[in-house]
A protein has these predicted regions:
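Short, intrinsically disordered N-terminal pre-domain segments
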Residues: 1-16, 188-190
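Residues that act as N-cap/strand-start positions at coil-to-secondary-structure junctions
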Residues: 4, 13-15, 85-87, 115, ...
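Terminal (often C-terminal
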Residues: 15, 22-113, 131-134, 169-190
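A short, structured loop/turn motif at beta-sheet edges
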Residues: 94-96, 122-127, 151-158
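Extracellular beta-strand-rich recognition modules
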Residues: 97-107, 143-147, 157-164
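Short, surface-exposed beta-strand/strand-loop-strand elements in extracellular ectodomains
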Residues: 112-126
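Solvent-exposed beta-strand/loop surfaces of large extracellular or lumenal domains
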Residues: 123-139
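Short proline/glycine- and polar residue-rich coil/turn motifs
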Residues: 135-142, 151-153
């Protein structure tokens, strides 16, 4: 024995469509609670400023791959996004929730000396998640990776990515679009 429930619209008690079907198997989620948005991904389109020992440097991810919801500022100045003030190279979502924040950065040095590096997610100007890389050889050139779930209030919290080098020579962030990335998406159900 089999049962079928055939509907074109699944609605809540207020008759708001949560899910619709076009009758051919294509479904559309109409409720934002079921979507991983806002979301974005950006990469470094050109070499950033040189990294100086002991100085936290904001990475200028200036080229967007996508920006669903218009919440990433890929410019060098403060702008208004969805009614919120977003500082340079920051993600400032206008929807509250937990977000998966991820970043990578390709660090290259002109000479081969060991480096220690701190790669950090900054929320509202303070580090909330830090990854430390200690070079085990004389060649530091490599990609730093970082990811964390971060609570965002949807009314002005913003995220930026910084890198700080210690114990070595100055270096720079390379503009490899596949290895110098910054992105975020809202986690469903949070």
């Amino acid at each position: 024995m089999t049962s079928k429930l055939k509907v074109n619209i699944l609605a809540d008690g207020g008759d708001n469509a949560i899910l619709t079907s076009d009758g051919s198997g294509s479904l559309t989620l109409n409720n934002d609670a079921f979507k991983n948005t806002p979301s974005f991904q950006a990469y470094l389109g050109s070499n950033s400023s040189n990294l100086t020992m002991g100085t936290a440097t904001k990475i200028e991810y200036n080229t967007e791959s996508w920006d669903v919801g218009g919440c990433y500022n890929n410019t060098g100045s403060t702008v208004n996004l969805n009614g919120l003030s977003a500082t340079a190279y920051s993600f400032c979502p206008n929807v509250a929730g937990k977000y998966w924040i991820y970043a990578t950065a390709r660090v290259d040095a002109s000479s081969n000396f060991p480096h220690d590096a701190y790669f950090a997610i900054y929320k509202n100007g303070s580090a909330v998640n830090i990854f430390q890389r200690v070079a085990q050889s004389t060649d530091f050139n490599g990609t730093l990776r970082l990811g964390a779930a971060v609570d965002m209030n949807g009314t002005g919290d913003l995220i930026q990515i910084y890198v700080t080098l210690y114990d070595g020579v100055n270096a720079f962030i390379s503009n490899y679009s596949s290895s110098t990335l910054f992105g975020a998406y809202r986690l469903i159900g949070t």
